[in-house]
Amino acid sequence: MRERSILNHRNKLCNYLIVSAFLILFYSCVKDKPNVQSTGNINISATHKVYITNEGNFMYNNSSVSFYNPDTKQVVQDIFKAQNPNITLGDVCQSIQKIGNNFYLVVNNSNKIVIVSADDFKYQQSITGFVSPRYILPVSFSKGYVSDLYANKIAVVNLSTKNIVSYIPCPGWTEKMIQFYNKVFVTNLYRNYLYVIDVLSDAIIDSIYVGKYASGIVLDKNENLWVLSSGESSSNQLPKLHKINPVTHQVLSTFTFSSADRPNNLVIDAARENLYFINQHIYKMSISATQLPTQYFIASQNNNFYSMEWNAVLDELYVSDAMDYVQNSTIYRYNKNGQLIHTFKAGINASGFWME
């Protein structure tokens, strides 16, 4: 059965292993193909910018970052290598976060976070000591939280000294996080709970029961949280979408998908009025809706939709198509009405976005 997307995270590890085995056979017979070349000179000072992290292939140390100028439609592949020719980014670049005047590149299978200058993408330093980091969230000017696949804890990073200073015990695969005043809400794929951390004490103060394989979380204009869980067929746990009050931690609404659905990759538009998620196709749902959408917003034309993000600056949707997980991803850029604006190539398994 063709899964909606490898972003159904538990399948991502299996696919990595399958693709890695294929690559060992494939590359033993043919020479490596080079990355897609730049279509122009790097203009890091562009008015609008989109950075795309490309995971690469698991165990092949070939992750990269693509740069896209939405005004000129210029694409620069592997901007990290272009600006740092003697440094390898690492294995599986999972996500990107801007903190101050630096970008933090979370390199999952290299157990590190690589810091580059936002001015020129030049390497600054790395933070090491992680087990398998996923995302970094700045919670104050001097402190950040890092989720992790295997560590069973959240790493607390000093953003001034750029090192791990403590940990917050949290069982399971911690994934995306969102801050609401002095609370951080942490999704967890292996547990059925959304964990609540007090930023002042760096301690878990509550847990909210949600569906299995929860990974998507957004905050709407009414200051309600939305959490998307992909479910688990082996334990008959259906996918669910929860609306949660972040003040009281009460679940306000629960929307349940069918056993055939595998929704993932929850995002919200610039007005924070409409939700979008991948479920083979791309669906749109108003935050005031009383039921799940039945008609897709953007149809999959035999695409392998892998990841997406809303560009809040230009009010546009960017969607990654991972193709066969071996060749370079295709990025589709849509306006808020779902009309295609531009299609371009990024690196292998494009999954993370930063827009400004």
Question: Would you name each region that the model predicts?
Answer:
Residues 3-17:
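Bacterial N-terminal signal peptides that target proteins for export
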Residues 25-28:
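C-terminal motif of bacterial Sec signal peptides marking the signal peptidase cleavage site
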Residues 30-356:
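Predominantly soluble domains enriched in secretory-pathway, periplasmic, or organellar proteins
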